[in-house]
């Protein structure tokens, strides 16, 4: 509902600021997105049954939430591999969230030389492929374990970004589409299996607490990644390909951190 309200506000503001046909296409896409958010939220309201909680207990926990982040980080150290996994997740979420924050679209136009329309089409293709990737990685995670699948996905991400740099440096246009396919497949994949990984490392009675840390790490990475990209591109003037390679370094750091974490659960969840 909140997302739909925000999209509606954006839609109204676009009506006010659109004096030519230049933004008509974007305006129509926002209208479609607004409707889809509402449509796909309906099953959650109709078919997902929530457990009833004692309001007094919930309110007490809410007041304690001011201290929960630091407390949870300290608590996570008591469980083997959990803190290390979260640190590793910060590095790969930093790289991936930097791309999906909108900087990839800029890269495709400014460095790869795609038109705005071609860029949108490639990103749309990547989104469709990500759905397939999520399903495939989910099945693979059940068979091979989330650790192996996470590491494999990180390796694919590194290859994907290196291919993007090669494509733009040597003007091999078709390679950028390979990047889109690999990246799309693995963005769906890594966010499918890393949740399973997280669950295996966390005791059932503290899942909510530690998933709060999981989310906090992702949000913090969303802030830090674009700042790093902007610093490399705009302050150091080293170019977008250097910024892209810096993301490869982040993924590599993440790979070696997570490689040392076992996905064998010590809990019966």
Residue ranges and their predicted role:
Residues 8-35, 231-251:
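A membrane-interface helix-boundary motif in multi-pass transporters
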Residues 36-48, 245-269:
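Multi-pass alpha-helical transporter architecture, strongest
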Residues 102-119:
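Short amphipathic helix-loop junctions that connect adjacent transmembrane helices
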Residues 133-146, 233:
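Helix-to-loop junctions at the C-terminal end of transmembrane segments
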Residues 155-170:
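C-terminal ends and interior cores of transmembrane alpha-helices
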């Amino acid at each position: 509902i909140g997302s739909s309200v925000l999209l509606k506000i954006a839609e109204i503001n676009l009506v006010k600021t659109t004096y030519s046909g230049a933004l008509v296409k974007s305006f129509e896409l926002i209208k479609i997105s607004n409707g889809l958010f509402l449509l796909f939220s309906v099953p959650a309201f109709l078919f997902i049954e929530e457990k009833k909680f004692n309001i007094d207990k919930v309110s007490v926990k809410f007041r304690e939430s001011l201290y929960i982040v630091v407390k949870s980080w300290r608590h996570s150290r008591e469980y083997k591999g959990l803190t290390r996994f979260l640190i590793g997740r910060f590095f790969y979420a930093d790289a991936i969230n930097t791309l999906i924050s909108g900087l990839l679209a800029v890269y495709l136009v400014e460095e790869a030389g795609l038109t705005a329309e071609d860029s949108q089409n490639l990103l749309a293709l990547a989104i469709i492929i990500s759905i397939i990737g999520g399903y495939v990685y989910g099945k693979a995670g059940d068979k091979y374990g989330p650790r192996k699948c996470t590491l494999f996905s990180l390796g694919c991400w590194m290859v994907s970004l290196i291919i993007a740099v090669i494509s733009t440096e040597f003007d091999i246009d078709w390679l950028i589409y390979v990047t889109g396919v690999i990246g799309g497949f693995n963005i769906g994949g890594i966010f499918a299996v890393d949740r399973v990984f997280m669950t295996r490392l966390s005791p059932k009675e503290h899942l909510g607490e530690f998933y709060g840390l999981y989310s906090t790490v992702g949000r913090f990475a969303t802030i830090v990644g674009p700042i790093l990209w902007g610093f490399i591109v705009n302050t150091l003037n080293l170019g977008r390909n250097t910024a892209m390679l810096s993301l490869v370094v982040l993924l590599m750091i993440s790979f070696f951190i997570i490689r040392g974490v076992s996905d064998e659960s010590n809990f019966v969840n």
